[in-house]
Amino acid sequence: MKQPGFIRLATLALLSTLSFFSHGETILRLAYAENSQPVKDALHFLGQQVEEKTGGDIKVQYFPDGQLGGERELVELTQVGVVDITKVSSGLMESFSPEYGVFSLPYLFATVEEYYRVMDNPQVMEPVYQSTAAQGFIGVGWYDSGARNFYMSKAPIKRIEDLRGKKIRVMQSETAIQTLKLLGASPIAMSQAEVYTSLQQGILDGAENNEFALTIARHGEVARYYTYDMHTRIPDILLMSTLTLEKLTPEQQRIVEAAIKASIEFEKAAWDKEIEKTRLAAVKDFNVEFYEIDKKPFQEAVQPIYDGLKNKPRLYGLYQRIQTAKN
């Protein structure tokens, strides 16, 4: 839960006065908004690895679950070095760098294996990570956040026609909004914090997210029809302030980089197990029903997005590299 505004402002004021160095130790401030358990565990594993491998010369200070604000606020705090490391959705990152918009392309990845090959390919990812360097931060890694699927309050999506006119919450992403329009729905961009009440009050007919939204955000209480169309696999992105990186020694940078890579593998291993637990909990606690569908009509409906990519040279070039890296 977020702190009240005046408490958060006081915390930020205090943080801004604290030195990066304290009694011979380097303090890295790692902040994140509400997350799935595998991502939380991976972030804490990252911190443990850094502290262990530096012999305690670097300590990691955590600000979890939105203590310092939502994801956009955390990016802005990372830009100015108040936060050293944060984790945000690449969907949000689209508003900071167009390159991140490629991960919002619908039905881009057919399998998890394809997805992992692309995300672990430095020729694909390094230009994306470095695209925000002039803004004061860069990407340094990624975490799996699963596939985004539709879930509805009154009836399941079994055919593309079932989406027609439905008010669906999406992230503030141009590509996500265009995707929903092509599928016949009425996309509504709003913060995650507003979704539960909006579903409950009928402002929304449904939303789209991974299975953790059903339990962590308790959306399964008010929208229990979950359909696997897997329209996107939008990764979470680890960001570091360039101010922070400049203060670390080359050896410290190497240790942090190795810890990030280890935490990525840690999170991958945990993801599938936690998803299955979440599915079972959603059925038990909220009577959620899960549906599989034929994705082909959905894929055909969004083809205009791909047809328009050639008019966006940077994005089209990245898309081509992704297609090559899949194999």
From Swiss-Prot:
Residues 1-24 form the signal peptide. Coiled coil: none annotated. InterPro entries: DctP_fam (IPR018389), TRAP_DctP (IPR004682), TRAP_DctP_sf (IPR038404). One of its GO terms (molecular function) is carbohydrate binding. GO terms for cellular component: outer membrane-bounded periplasmic space. The keyword Signal applies. Keywords: Signal. Pfam families: DctP (PF03480). GO terms for biological process: transmembrane transport. NCBIfam families: dctP, TRAP_S1. PANTHER family: DICARBOXYLATE-BINDING PERIPLASMIC PROTEIN (PTHR33376:SF2), PTHR33376. This is Uncharacterized protein YiiZ. It comes from Salmonella typhimurium (strain LT2 / SGSC1412 / ATCC 700720). The gene is yiiZ.
